[in-house]
Regions:
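Bacterial N-terminal signal peptides
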Residues: 16-27
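N-terminal secretory signal peptides that target proteins for export/translocation
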Residues: 1-11
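Generic detector of low-complexity/intrinsically disordered segments
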Residues: 9-12, 28, 34
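Intrinsic disorder/low-complexity detector
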Residues: 7-8, 16, 137
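Ser/Thr-rich, low-complexity intrinsically disordered terminal regions
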Residues: 30-195
Length: 195
């Protein structure tokens, strides 16, 4: 009897081992999950302008003050009626949209894998329409950099960037698109309108 029980136990162990081995090989041979990239939705063209009922000199002075004190923008310079400024932005996904990788925001994916940086270069142009009114126009150029790979996207308020990546996900297009979410532009032009 004990020999029969031993044989029965050996059969059960053997069946268990074969089943586990089969499951292991079955899962090991399954296809790896592929990364999928989804392009961002196109943003409509926005005209970031404002007409302020003040002369060009006083509004230019107020804008410089706004940029340096309220927004902490660095490297402010003025040439004639054009003001330039630069700011390094944290939280990239608040300002730019480069689509999605799987279910993750692409710029967050890049930052998690490679680390990244985002710089915004501002150009504010003033044009006197008459003695007491000034037209203000704003354009922002962005530079988004994947720090480890050095991949760089350069785009502006209304002009998206399209780059080719060296190693795209298998079966995916090697093209990536980045565009402004217009967050910074809308915030800044709103503050300028309130001057």
């Amino acid at each position: 009897m004990s020999t029969r029980n031993n044989l029965r136990q050996l059969k059960i162990i053997n069946i268990f081992f074969v089943s586990i081995t089969f499951i292991f090989f079955l899962t090991a041979c399954s296809e790896l999950e592929q990364n999928q990239y989804f392009s961002p939705n196109a943003q409509p063209y926005n005209d970031f302008t404002a007409t302020i009922n003040r002369d060009v000199v006083s509004i230019g002075s107020e804008i410089s003050k706004l940029l340096s004190q309220d927004l902490a923008i660095k490297d402010i310079s003025t040439e004639g009626n054009t003001t330039f400024g630069q700011i390094n932005l944290a939280n990239t996904s608040l300002y730019v949209d480069c689509g999605m990788m799987n279910n993750e925001i692409y710029v967050d994916y890049i930052n998690r894998i490679f680390e990244s940086s985002l710089r915004a270069d501002l150009v504010i142009q003033l044009k006197e329409t008459n003695q007491n009114a000034t037209n203000v126009s704003l354009d922002i150029s962005y530079t988004f950099i994947s720090l480890e790979s050095g991949t760089t996207w350069k785009f502006s308020s209304n002009k998206p960037a399209s780059i080719w990546v060296g190693t795209p996900a298998e079966g995916a297009l090697p093209q990536r698109v980045c565009l402004s979410r217009h967050t910074l532009e809308e915030s800044l032009i709103s503050k300028i309108r309130d001057l």
